[in-house]
Curated annotation (Swiss-Prot):
Pfam families: Ribosomal_L23. Gene3D superfamilies: 3.30.70.330. One of its GO terms (molecular function) is rRNA binding. Part of the 50S ribosomal subunit. Contacts protein L29, and trigger factor when it is bound to the ribosome. One of its GO terms (biological process) is translation. GO terms for cellular component: ribonucleoprotein complex; ribosome. It comes from the Bacteria. InterPro entries: Nucleotide-bd_a/b_plait_sf (IPR012677), Ribosomal_uL23-like (IPR013025), Ribosomal_uL23/eL15/eS24_sf (IPR012678). Belongs to the universal ribosomal protein uL23 family. This is Large ribosomal subunit protein uL23.
Length: 98
């Protein structure tokens, strides 16, 4: 079990798709790869003081990239799509959901 909820949520995802999901009250975060949905839900509720309805997770495989010295890898990451209860918002983006 991860003791501190701020260790679970690493940072918000800033992309066109995540801004579009703000209209549906869904927020996207990059989370620890070993965090499960229950830990993510509890962390968001404790950090932002909101009610979480649903958590969907996406495991993204790291891409193989060419460098000057041969082949390398981007690190794999895990994203969490967090759906909030109607009326709850998180003030992290300057978008329409904020």
């Amino acid at each position: 079990m991860i003791p501190d909820p701020r260790d679970v949520i690493l940072r918000p995802v800033v992309s066109e798709k995540s801004y579009g999901l703000l209209d549906e009250n869904v927020y996207t975060f990059i989370v620890r790869p070993d965090a499960n949905k229950t830990q993510i839900k509890l962390a968001v509720q404790q950090i932002f003081n909101v009610r979480v309805l649903r958590v969907n997770t996406i495991n993204r495989q790291g891409k193989r990239k060419r460098t000057k010295h041969g082949w390398g890898h981007r690190s794999a990451s895990k994203r969490a799509l967090v759906s909030l209860a109607p009326g709850d918002t998180i003030e992290i983006f300057g978008g329409p959901g904020a």
